[in-house]
């Protein structure tokens, strides 16, 4: 499997995890818009702690799941910072 196919599979898994999370009542479909940088960082660190626990327990199935959570929160924070940068420069979306 080449890099592109691996990245595509990972992105599909991230999206499935995202959809599972945002379909719950009360969850926002756009955390990169609706949450502050501080809240996104806090949630990212929580997910990293859960990832660390999965590694320590050698729980490989849960480790895969936690990697998706960390990746999603990295993307949400990246999106927040990117959108903020666009607005700070006065550019359109």
From Swiss-Prot:
Kindly state which keywords UniProt assigns to this record, in alphabetical order: Coiled coil
Pfam family for this entry, one: MazG
Extract the InterPro entries matched here: AF0060_NTP-PPase_MazG-like, MazG-like_dom
**Coiled-coil zones:** 36-69
In terms of SUPFAM superfamilies, this protein maps to: all-alpha NTP pyrophosphatases (SSF101386)
- Does the keyword Coiled coil belong to this entry? yes
**Keyword Repressor among record annotations:** no
Know the name of this protein? Uncharacterized protein AF_0060
């Amino acid at each position: 499997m080449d890099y592109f196919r691996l990245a595509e599979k990972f992105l599909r898994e991230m999206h499935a995890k995202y959809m599972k999370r945002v379909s719950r009542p009360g969850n926002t479909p756009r955390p990169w818009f609706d949450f502050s940088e501080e809240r996104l960082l806090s949630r990212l660190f929580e997910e990293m702690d859960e990832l660390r626990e999965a590694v320590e327990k050698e729980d490989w199935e849960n480790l895969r799941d936690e990697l998706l959570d960390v990746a999603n929160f990295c993307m949400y924070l990246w999106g927040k910072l990117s959108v903020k940068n666009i607005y700070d420069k006065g550019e359109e979306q």
